[in-house]
Regions:
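Short, charged beta-turn/beta-strand-edge "cap" motif at the junction between a beta-strand
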Residues: 13, 601-602, 610, 665-666, ...
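Catalytic cores of soluble metabolic enzymes centered on carboxylation/carboxyl-transfer
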Residues: 323-575, 687-763
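Structured functional modules or segments
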Residues: 629-720
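Short amphipathic alpha-helical segments
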Residues: 194, 264-267, 430-436, 632
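Structured, non-catalytic alpha/beta "coupling" segments that mediate domain-domain communication
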Residues: 97-104, 383, 393, 590-622
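N-terminal beta-alpha lobe that positions the nucleotide/phosphoryl donor
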Residues: 1-298, 302-322, 328
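Conserved nucleotide-binding/hydrolysis modules and their immediate coupling elements
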Residues: 568-571, 576-593, 599-602
Length: 763
């Protein structure tokens, strides 16, 4: 019995790996009793109801917190593997997947590693080494801190490495003068958007360098010139332990934010086929040169204007987007990883044989992979990563509970999710918790299908989500025309270009928020009244006014003075600045949400817990009504960890500039001062943060300059409740009588009806 031990790389990876290995197990042995899957899990993962825990045969609980305590801890991984008597360990991506110490330690205990050997990982997994080796193979490399350095073999001397590596901000400044701006600061051991910063000036370099250090502690750092107007193309390579290497076409992963992919697709359509062949051949040559074994990815930058390309890096592991390649080739990559670790040559793997057009998929005849033709791509696959990020705030990571997740499968659509209903995304997790793939004959058709699939996907909870933003990106003309670059999405974010639902205006959002708050308050007051009466205490007078609620809501820095009156359990009247604005009919849903009929449209509204305001989801779109801001307090916008202060204690902070840095889901982010004045540190670096926690107190320099929410003035859009449809063949007098009778009953029940004077007419 073989026992792989998948480690949650992020958890969505473990879910995918388990399913792929189970599929191979049944295809090969027609049973589910061959593989016994054991997973590591933290208490945070258990509380988050991580899906991979349910799929595994067993799990072993390890320490929570930073990945240094668990999934990046080589000693712990080996200890767990030995404890469960594992035959193999699947490392996924991230964490310890690119640490050569892991395969070395596992080999010492005769445990297979489903990845490359330590020597080949050393050779190409380190980004600095990979660039030097690429230069040595006459592969074009864009200018960087190690330009011109070459070696004869695959072993890179320490002094050569030192010449390419930067050990301080001062060394980075000297190298930047040679490389030129704009440039990238990179951690050699980084990946997945971690340990990388784009800078345009020396001042930005001085800020970005320590941020890269903090995201990937202990990693060597280098700089690289930024390639403009480029596409991010990558080649999937597979190599066995017998010297055979093949490429499985390429992928285009050019839609990125913070240098982390968000939409992937394949095969490559932006470059001519002859260019793609050169990329694939170069990837195979590099893998052969270093004696690579396992599954890996060779990445390139392709200039869409000139048609030139240059080497970027090698990822010596499976990547998040590998199902794109699986879809267009029919090759199960986690299963291939397992077979490579078992010593099986590529020509004896059924999926590889099918890909090379061999009629006998279970045969063992040799294949000349250098000359044998491959099957053409099986259509086009496009994928979108589902992340717990807030697109309205530059894709800031968020964490919290997930109350609802529904994914409707369509023909040609698949989805992998690391959590389900009653799950969540904790602060130490990766922000990605889902991946949706659409497969059709052409790129255009795949894009349409992915957009439709995202429209059918619903996620509701304490987290923010990128689903609607993803769908808007796919529908943009630049993307549909295949004319975007790696800088496209970051440019949209910088320009605050957000998808706009023209039917969901600010006034409609305020009305939905007002109805939800009034509905919630009604039941809160009702509970207090019942509790008081149960205890034999007369309720206070303010508790008994269940049908009228006065409050303010702030949206987009505008403050709305609202008065909401209930005419019945299902009818709400809203006044803005004491002027009638809305009549809304409400249906309470089984999951606690409301269906609000407003201005001829039905909106599904859910409220989510928040310490700093009212958060609602309107048709899946998160909308936030913050509490009034206190200019003397600077607070945490979400969960995370305080890393360091950028402004000293009892020093002056300038509004609009960073005053500290926090770590949110493995990403370093600045907090921006909301007032100008002398700040007092209230927390020590390393402190855990929750939403609303006060980080600094501020002695405001000029109270008159404090930005406050402006009261709403002007004319508010008028909304009416839904109108009856269909045929009512009743006497008009009888209808009027029934309506009046219903209104009287509601008034006697304690409800109010602002429309009494117009509703009740003589007949």
């Amino acid at each position: 019995m073989s026992t792989p031990c998948p480690l949650p790389p992020p958890p969505v990876g473990a879910v995918k790996a388990i399913r792929s290995l189970r599929l191979w197990e049944y295809e090969t042995f027609r049973t589910h009793d061959v593989l016994h899957v054991v997973c590591m899990a933290t208490e945070d993962d258990l509380k988050a109801n991580a899906e991979y825990i349910r799929l595994a045969d067993e799990f072993i609980v390890v320490e929570s917190g930073s990945n240094r305590n668990n999934y990046a801890n080589v000693d712990l991984i080996v200890k767990v593997a030995r404890r469960c008597e594992a035959d193999a360990v699947w490392p996924g991506w991230g964490h310890a997947s690119e640490n050569p110490k892991l395969p070395t330690a596992l080999a010492y205990h005769d445990i297979a590693f489903l990845g490359p050997s330590a020597s080949s990982m050393d050779a190409v997994g380190d980004k600095i080494c990979a660039n030097i080796l690429a230069q040595s193979c006459d592969v074009d490399v864009i200018p960087w801190s190690g330009s011109g350095l070459t070696v004869e073999g695959i072993t890179i001397p320490e002094d050569t490495l030192r010449m390419a590596t930067l050990r301080s901000v001062e060394e980075a400044e000297i190298s930047a003068q040679k490389v030129g701006f704009p440039l990238m600061i990179k951690a050699s051991e980084g990946g997945g958007g971690k340990g990388i910063r784009m800078v345009n000036t020396m001042d930005e370099l001085r800020v970005g360098y320590p941020q890269v250090q903090a995201e990937v502690p202990g990693s060597p750092i280098f700089i690289q010139q930024l390639s403009t107007n480029a596409r991010h193309l990558e080649v999937q390579v597979v190599a066995d332990q017998h010297g055979n290497v093949v490429s499985l076409y390429g992928r285009d992963c050019s839609v990125q934010r913070r240098h982390q992919k968000i939409i992937e697709e394949g095969p490559v359509t932006v470059a001519p086929r002859e260019t793609c062949v050169k990329l694939e051949q170069g990837a195979v040559r590099l893998a052969k040169k270093v004696g690579y074994s396992g599954v890996g990815t060779v990445e390139y930058l392709y200039n869409i204007t000139t048609g030139e390309y240059s080497f970027l890096e090698v990822n010596p592991r499976l990547q998040v987007e590998h199902p794109v390649t699986e879809t267009i080739t029919g090759v199960n990559l986690p299963a291939v990883q397992l077979q490579i670790a078992m010593g099986i040559p590529l020509h004896k793997m059924p999926h590889i044989r099918k890909f090379y057009g061999q009629l006998d998929a279970n045969g063992v005849s040799p294949i000349d992979f250098d000359t044998a033709p491959q099957n053409p791509p099986l259509g086009h696959c496009m994928a979108g990563r589902i992340t717990a990020e807030n697109p309205d705030e530059g894709f800031k990571p968020t964490s919290g509970a997930i109350h609802e997740l529904h994914f409707r499968s369509l023909p040609g659509v698949t989805g992998n999710f690391s959590v389900g209903v009653s799950g969540g995304v904790h602060q130490f997790a990766d922000s990605q918790f889902g991946h949706v793939f659409a497969h059709k004959s052409t790129r255009e058709e795949a894009g349409v299908l992915l957009s439709q699939a995202l429209g059918e996907l619903g996620v509701r909870g304490e987290i923010h989500c990128n689903i609607k933003y993803l769908r808007a990106l796919i529908e943009k003309e630049v993307f549909r025309n295949d004319a975007h670059s790696t800088a496209w999405l970051d440019g949209l974010i910088a320009a605050k270009d957000k998808p706009v639902d023209l039917s969901l205006t600010a006034h409609a959002i305020v009305m939905c928020g007002a109805v939800m708050r009034a509905h919630t308050r009604h039941f809160e007051l009702e509970e207090r009244v019942v509790d008081a009466l149960t205890r034999g205490v007369p309720p206070e007078a303010w508790m008994t006014n269940l049908s009228e609620h006065k409050f303010e809501l702030i949206y987009d820095d505008v403050k709305y003075a609202l008065r909401v009156t209930q005419g019945s359990p299902t009818l709400f009247y809203v006044r803005v600045n004491n002027v009638a604005a809305c009549e809304a009919e409400v249906l309470t849903l089984a999951n606690g949400g409301l269906k609000v009929f407003l201005g001829g449209r039905a909106r599904v509204v859910h409220a989510e817990p928040s310490k700093v305001g009212l958060k609602v989801h309107i048709d899946g779109r998160p909308c936030f009504f913050p509490d009034d801001r206190d200019p003397t307090r600077m607070t945490a916008p979400g969960t995370g960890k305080l890393l360091r202060y950028l402004v000293a204690d009892n020093a002056r902070a300038q509004e609009g500039t960073p005053y500290c840095e926090i770590e949110v889901m493995k990403t370093v982010m600045p907090l921006i001062a909301t007032s100008t004045g002398i700040i007092t540190h209230l927390l020590q670096p390393g402190a855990s943060l929750e939403t609303g926690d006060e980080v600094c107190a501020v002695q405001v320099e000029d109270p008159s300059s404090v930005r406050v929410s402006e009261p709403f003035v002007g004319e508010f859009t008028s909304f009416q409740a839904r109108k009856l449809t269909g045929s009512l063949k009743l006497d008009s007098a009888l209808v009027t009588h029934n309506l009046n009778s219903a209104g009287i009953i509601q008034i006697l029940a304690g409800y109010d009806s602002p429309g009494t004077t117009t509703r009740f007419r003589r007949f």
